[in-house]
C-alpha cells in the first residue's frame, strides 16, 4: 500500500492478487444484473512522492503494458458473463504520456468503450495553446476528443466522454455545460456523461439549446 499527498491508498498494479480482487467485484456486479463493468482509477499512482514507491513481486510486463494486460485479463473473465467492459481514462492521456500507464491506443484493444474525463478545469494554462482551457470548455473538450479520435483510429472501442458539470477554478454556467455537449456532438461520439461529485446537475443542460444560440464549441480543431 502506498499513500499519496491526500492520504489516498494505492495498491500494486503489478500484483495479480489485486487484479483478481477487482475483477471478482466486476463478476459479482455482472451476476447481479449490471450490463457494463466500468473500471475507474485503472492506472499507476500519482500526486505524491512516487520516487519512493517500490513494487515488490513479479513484473510480468513493463509499466506501459501493465494496465492493458489487466484490461485484457478482465475482458477474458467478464465477457462470458455477457457484459460490456470499459475504462475511465484521464482526459490528457491521448495527448501526452502522463507516466501513469494509461495508453488509449493499447487499452482500447480490449474494451468496448473508453470514458475520457475531459474536465477543462483540470487542464493547465497553455494546454492546446489555450491561455486558459477552463475559460473555453467547449474548445478544450473539442481538442481532447480530437486527440482521442486519433489515438483510437481503427479501434472498435467507443469514445464516451465524461463532461464537467461542476465548478472548479470558476463558476460553471449552463452555457459552459452546453458548450461541452455541443463539442461532443460535433465529433459524433457514442454519447457523453456528466459528472458532479455531489450529484447536483445543471438544470436544463440536457435540453436542446435555442436555435439562435452560438458557442465557442463551434470551433473544431484542425490538423
What name fits each language-model region?
Residues 111-125, 133-217, 221-223:
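Substrate-binding cleft of secreted/luminal carbohydrate-active enzymes
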Amino acid at each position: 500500500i502506498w499513500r499519496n499527498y491526500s492520504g489516498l491508498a494505492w495498491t500494486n498494479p503489478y500484483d495479480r492478487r489485486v487484479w483478481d480482487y477487482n475483477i471478482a467485484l466486476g463478476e459479482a456486479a455482472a451476476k447481479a444484473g449490471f450490463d457494463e463493468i466500468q473500471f475507474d482509477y485503472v492506472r499507476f499512482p500519482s500526486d505524491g512522492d512516487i520516487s519512493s514507491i517500490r513494487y515488490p513481486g513479479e513484473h510480468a510486463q513493463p509499466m506501459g503494458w501493465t494496465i492493458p494486460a489487466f484490461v485484457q485479463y478482465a475482458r477474458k473473465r467478464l465477457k462470458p458473463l455477457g457484459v460490456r467492459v470499459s475504462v475511465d481514462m484521464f482526459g490528457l492521456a491521448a495527448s501526452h504520456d502522463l507516466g501513469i500507464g494509461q495508453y488509449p491506443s493499447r487499452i482500447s484493444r480490449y474494451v468496448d468503450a473508453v470514458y475520457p474525463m475531459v474536465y477543462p478545469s483540470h487542464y493547465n494554462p497553455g494546454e492546446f495553446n489555450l491561455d486558459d482551457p477552463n475559460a473555453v470548455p467547449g474548445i478544450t473538450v473539442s481538442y481532447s476528443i480530437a486527440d482521442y479520435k486519433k489515438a483510437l483510429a481503427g479501434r472498435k472501442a467507443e469514445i464516451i466522454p465524461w463532461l464537467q458539470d461542476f465548478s472548479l477554478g470558476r463558476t460553471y454556467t449552463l452555457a459552459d455545460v452546453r458548450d461541452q455537449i455541443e463539442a461532443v456532438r460535433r465529433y459524433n461520439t457514442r454519447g457523453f456523461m456528466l459528472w458532479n461529485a455531489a450529484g447536483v446537475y445543471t438544470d436544463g443542460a440536457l435540453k436542446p439549446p435555442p436555435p439562435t444560440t452560438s458557442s465557442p464549441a463551434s470551433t473544431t480543431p484542425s490538423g
